[in-house]
Amino acid sequence: MTTMTPGMQLPPGGRPRLATGSWRVDPAQSHASFAVSVVGRPVRGRLPLSGGVLITEPIEDSRARLIARAGAVSTGSPVLDRLLAGSGFLDAAAFPEISFRSELLTWTPAGWRVIGRLQVKNAEHELACRLALHLGGTRPDGSPRILITSSWVIDSRWITRQWIPGLGRRVVMTCSCSLEPDRGLTGGADEH
């Protein structure tokens, strides 16, 4: 017997999944956070996320698109934020968006996995990551808040070609997306 809450299904065996349909990323509750080592010290920051998800049957044909505004990078330091958004790093004036587009969603014995393309500064990079699905409280209208978290590691050379003394090669990313039903979506995640 499948246990259901509005928007989430928990079939026998316990692997939760979104119900089929269109979902919108709530930008007020969603972000990508990052950590990178610079001269042996961690630098942490965030980027707000928007986008959409289309869950289909079979699940492998589902699609997701996440978008982060490069100019909205936030580390808690206005000077560092300007540096990261500037031409030496994210170059937000020339490349205002960083995006992820899924190509395959699948369940493995270790959990949900997604394979897709991360676009940074007009260059695409293949990316695979694991996903976790959670109920995250209740929305003001009483419907459940559904959270998807994912994590991956990217190469700092995807962000900058400049040699920066002490900049670590690994950038650890974690995305936290709060999803809500998208009743106005007509064509799926590719429209976001």
Indicate residue ranges for each PLM-predicted region.
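Low-complexity, acidic/polar, glycine-enriched regions of mature
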Residues: 1-192
